C-alpha cells in the first residue's frame, strides 16, 4: 500500500503526542517493492555429463560466481545481459502462512526417495535385491515429515508473498513469465525499470534445457525465479529447447508415458496394456535428471546459496509454471503460475506434500488461468485436438494449491482456442481489464467452475473437437479484446479486479487408468 509523505511523518510525531501504546509490528502487512538488474545465470548440458551445469554471472565477468566448474566464455559476452529501462513496474506484497517441513528436503526427488525407503522398510524388502529402485536411490538421512502430524514435523511460517488481490502485481509477474521466453535484449522484452532482470539461465546458443531469468530487489530481500514454458509446435515457434520441452510435457502431463494410442511413441516404458500403467516405473521416470523439475532443484539450491536471507518466489507460464509449482511445493516457496497444465498428477507421483495434510491455502501455490485455454483446463486432448496433432499428450487437468480462474468464456464470450494459451494474449486481453466482482447473494462463479469440473471439461472438449471436425477453426475466433463493462463515468482501477482464489478439491485425473505393479 502506498503511504503519502505526511502520513509517514505523522507516524514519527504521534508517539510524542499520544499516550503510550503497545509497540506496532516492524513492517506493515502490505507493502510495495521494486527491483534492479544485478546478475545473469546460465545452465547447459556439457559433453559427457549426466547432470546439467549451472553458472552465475554478475554484470562484470570479473565478478562471476560459478556454481560448477564451467568455462565462462560459453555463456557469452556482456552484451547478452539485459539493460532494462522504462516504465516503473512494482509488486505489492503481503504476509501469508505457508506450511513447511521443519527439516528442508535436499532435492525435489527427496520426497519420492523417502517414500520408497519407508515403503521398503514397512514391507521388509531388501533394497539391494530390489530391481524396482534402479532410478530412485534411497536417501541417507532425510525422511519426509508425516503430514498426519503437522504440529510435530511441520511449521506454519509467515512469509512475504505477492499480493494477488492486486491486479498490477498479477500483471507484473505475468510479464516476468513472458520475459523468460526471450533472449535478454531481444525482441519481445517487457522493459522493467527498477526491477532486476538478473541471471538469464539457459540462454547459451546450444543449450536445450531449463531456461529463464531471475529477479531481485535492491536489498536482495526478495528474489523471483521465472521459468520458460514450452517453445515447440502448437505452443510456440520452436527453438533449441523444443525437443526437451515436448519430452517433459509428455512425461509430466500424460496419464502413462504419452501412450495415447498405438500410433504414439511412449516417452517411458511403463505401459502395461489396455488402461494399465506401472506406478513405480512412472515415479522412476519422473526423477530422471532430464526432467525439468529435478533440474530446477539445482537452480533453486544455488539461488538460496547466493541469497541465504532472501525470500524466494517462483513464476512461469505453461510448462514453466508447472515446474515452478513443483519446486515451490518441494521447498515451501511461494509460486504463481500462468496457464499451467494440471500439475497435480506429477506432484502426486513425486510424493510432494498435498491435501489433506497440506491444505491448499497453506501451500503457497497459486495458478492463474482462464476458461478458454484448453491446455490449462485439461481439454486439449483427443484425436481432433491441436495438442494431439502436434504430438503433445496434455491429459492432466487438476492443479495443486489455489486457482484464480478467469471465466473468459462467460464474461468475454470467448470460444475455446489453443491460441489463447499464449502469455501475451493473457497479459493483453485477460489481465489488462479489471475483472467484475461477484454480485452479493450469488454463489461463486469460480467455485462452481471448479466443482463442476467434469461437466465443464466435457462440454469444452466436445466444443473443441467439433470445431476441428467442421474445419472452421479460423472462423471460430471469439477472443478479441472485449472485456468487462465499466460503470458510466467510472475509471479503470489499477488495483483490485482479480477473481478470488479457490481450490480444485473435486478434480480427478486419468480416471480411466489403473496404476499398479504389472511386471
UniProtKB/Swiss-Prot annotation:
Its EC number is 3.1.1.3. Keywords: Autophagy, Endosome, Glycoprotein, Hydrolase, Lipid degradation, Lipid metabolism, Membrane, Signal-anchor, Transmembrane, Transmembrane helix. The active site is at residue 318. One of its GO terms (molecular function) is phospholipase activity. InterPro entries: AB_hydrolase_fold, ATG15_Lipase, Fungal_lipase-type. Lipase which is essential for lysis of subvacuolar cytoplasm to vacuole targeted bodies and intravacuolar autophagic bodies. Involved in the lysis of intravacuolar multivesicular body (MVB) vesicles. The intravacuolar membrane disintegration by ATG15 is critical to life span extension. This is Putative lipase ATG15. It comes from Cryptococcus neoformans var. neoformans serotype D (strain B-3501A). The lineage of its organism: Eukaryota, Fungi, Dikarya, Basidiomycota, Agaricomycotina. The gene is ATG15.
Amino acid at each position: 500500500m502506498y503511504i503519502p509523505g505526511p502520513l509517514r511523518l505523522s507516524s514519527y510525531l504521534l508517539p510524542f503526542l499520544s499516550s503510550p501504546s503497545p509497540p506496532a509490528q516492524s513492517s506493515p502487512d502490505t507493502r510495495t517493492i521494486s527491483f534492479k538488474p544485478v546478475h545473469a545465470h546460465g545452465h547447459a548440458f556439457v559433453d559427457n555429463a549426466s547432470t546439467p551445469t549451472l553458472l552465475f554471472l554478475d554484470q562484470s565477468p570479473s565478478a562471476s560466481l560459478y556454481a560448477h566448474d564451467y568455462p565462462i566464455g560459453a555463456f557469452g559476452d556482456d552484451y547478452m545481459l539485459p539493460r532494462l529501462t522504462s516504465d516503473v513496474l512494482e509488486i505489492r506484497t503481503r504476509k501469508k502462512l505457508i506450511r513447511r517441513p521443519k527439516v528442508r528436503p535436499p532435492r525435489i526427488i527427496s520426497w519420492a526417495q523417502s517414500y520408497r525407503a519407508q515403503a521398503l522398510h514397512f514391507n521388509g524388502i531388501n533394497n539391494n535385491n530390489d530391481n524396482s529402485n534402479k532410478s530412485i536411490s534411497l536417501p541417507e538421512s532425510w525422511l519426509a515429515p508425516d503430514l498426519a502430524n503437522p504440529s510435530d514435523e511441520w511449521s506454519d511460517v509467515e512469509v512475504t508473498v505477492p499480493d494477488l488481490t492486486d491486479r498490477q502485481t498479477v500483471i507484473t509477474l505475468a510479464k516476468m513469465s513472458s520475459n523468460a521466453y526471450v533472449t535478454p535484449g531481444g525482441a519481445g522484452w517487457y522493459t522493467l525499470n527498477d526491477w532486476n532482470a538478473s541471471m538469464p539461465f539457459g540462454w547459451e546458443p546450444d543449450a536445450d534445457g531449463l531456461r529463464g531469468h531471475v529477479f531481485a530487489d535492491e536489498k536482495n530481500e526478495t528474489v523471483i525465479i521465472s521459468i520458460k514454458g514450452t517453445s515447440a509446435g502448437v505452443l510456440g515457434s520452436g527453438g533449441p529447447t523444443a525437443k526437451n520441452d515436448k519430452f517433459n510435457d509428455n512425461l509430466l502431463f500424460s496419464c502413462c508415458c504419452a501412450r495415447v494410442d498405438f500410433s504414439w511413441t511412449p516417452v517411458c516404458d511403463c505401459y502395461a496394456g489396455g488402461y494399465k500403467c506401472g506406478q513405480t516405473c512412472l515415479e522412476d521416470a519422473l526423477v530422471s535428471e532430464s526432467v525439468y523439475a529435478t533440474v530446477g532443484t539445482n537452480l533453486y539450491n544455488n539461488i538460496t546459496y547466493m541469497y541465504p536471507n532472501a525470500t524466494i518466489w517462483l513464476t512461469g507460464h505453461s510448462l514453466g509454471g508447472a515446474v515452478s509449482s513443483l519446486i515451490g511445493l518441494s521447498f515451501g516457496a511461494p509460486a504463481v503460475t500462468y496457464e499451467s497444465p494440471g500439475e497435480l498428477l506429477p506432484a502426486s507421483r513425486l510424493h510432494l506434500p498435498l491435501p489433506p495434510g497440506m491444505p491448499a491455502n497453506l501451500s503457497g501455490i497459486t495458478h492463474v488461468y482462464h476458461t478458454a485455454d484448453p491446455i490449462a483446463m485439461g481439454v486439449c486432448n483427443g484425436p481432433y485436438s491441436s495438442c494431439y496433432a502436434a504430438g503433445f499428450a496434455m491429459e492432466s487437468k487438476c492443479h495443486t494449491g489455489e486457482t484464480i480462474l478467469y471465466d473468459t468464456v462467460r464474461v468475454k464470450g470467448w470460444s475455446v482456442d489453443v491460441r489463447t494459451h499464449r502469455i501475451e494474449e493473457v497479459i493483453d486481453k485477460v489481465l489488462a481489464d479489471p475483472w467484475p466482482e461477484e454480485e452479493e447473494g450469488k454463489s461463486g462463479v469460480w467455485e462452481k467452475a471448479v466443482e463442476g469440473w467434469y461437466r465443464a471439461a466435457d462440454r469444452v472438449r466436445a466444443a473443441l473437437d467439433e470445431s476441428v471436425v467442421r474445419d472452421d477453426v479460423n472462423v471460430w475466433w471469439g477472443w478479441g479484446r472485449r472485456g468487462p463493462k465499466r460503470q458510466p463515468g467510472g475509471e479503470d482501477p489499477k488495483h483490485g479486479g482479480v477473481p478470488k482464489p479457490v481450490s480444485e478439491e473435486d478434480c480427478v485425473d486419468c480416471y480411466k487408468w489403473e496404476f499398479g505393479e504389472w511386471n
